[in-house]
């Protein structure tokens, strides 16, 4: 399952140089420290839960699954957000993740 948030896809079409610069920035941030890719994706997933971004939560869940994260690790990352972002935001994010996991199984 491939997923690209609609707004980012639109940005890439309209402003390809801006999108390319952002992608380069994101890549440099990822290389700047000792965290492995799976840990990076799970941290970013928690951040996406915090801002309540469905597209980012689903995109990062897809990326984490495509890497080495298990479905249970992804669920755990979302569950951990509850004490910081609140139960309602966590539970809706968990549903977004479950949709991705279900789609991956099909």
Report each predicted region and the residues it spans.
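Acidic, glycine/proline-rich low-complexity segments that act as flexible tails and inter-domain linkers
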Residues: 1-40, 62-65, 91-106
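Short alpha-helical scaffolding segments that buttress acidic/His motifs in well-ordered protein cores
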Residues: 22, 42-49, 77-84
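Residues at alpha-helix boundaries and short interhelical turns
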Residues: 33, 50-54, 68, 85-88
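Mid-chain, well-packed structural core segment of small domains
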Residues: 52-80
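C-terminal structural segments of small proteins and small subunits
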Residues: 75-100
